[in-house]
């Protein structure tokens, strides 16, 4: 007796027919997505070997150490060479003669 009354209510009331299943889908989907996204975070939390972790901590590279490496380098004697466009010949543009680049075999 209870089932026909419920089915009749679903057919007559659009909120019960469309709204409740939609809300169940949204709420259930959010719980499902939470489980799938938790897998991603669990995979990232992998343990590292302690010896390897010590080596990585010793080899820290800082901005100051890199600056000290290139501080004494000279960058004043460089030449700006424009790269060729797709329709240009790169050998002629850069001052190289294509005939002189070919090796002569006799």
UniProtKB/Swiss-Prot annotation:
The associated disease is: Mitochondrial complex IV deficiency, nuclear type 22: An autosomal recessive mitochondrial disorder characterized by hypertrophic cardiomyopathy, encephalopathy, fatal lactic acidosis, and isolated complex IV deficiency.
Q: Which family does it belong to?
A: Belongs to the COX16 family.
Where in or outside the cell is it found? Mitochondrion inner membrane
Q: What is the recorded name of this protein?
A: Cytochrome c oxidase assembly protein COX16 homolog, mitochondrial
An example Gene Ontology biological process = mitochondrial cytochrome c oxidase assembly
GO CC annotation, single: mitochondrial inner membrane
Q: Which UniProt keywords apply?
A: Disease variant, Membrane, Mitochondrion, Mitochondrion inner membrane, Primary mitochondrial disease, Transmembrane, Transmembrane helix
Instruction: Provide the primary localization.
Output: mitochondrion
Q: Which organism is it from?
A: Homo sapiens (Human)
Q: Which gene encodes it?
A: COX16
What segments bear the compositional bias annotation Basic and acidic residues? Answer: 77-88
State what this protein does: Required for the assembly of the mitochondrial respiratory chain complex IV (CIV), also known as cytochrome c oxidase. Promotes the insertion of copper into the active site of cytochrome c oxidase subunit II (MT-CO2/COX2). Interacts specifically with newly synthesized MT-CO2/COX and its copper center-forming metallochaperones SCO1, SCO2 and COA6. Probably facilitates MT-CO2/COX2 association with the MITRAC assembly intermediate containing MT-CO1/COX1, thereby participating in merging the MT-CO1/COX1 and MT-CO2/COX2 assembly lines.
Q: Which tissues is it found in, per the record? A: Widely expressed. Expressed at higher level in skeletal muscle, heart and liver.
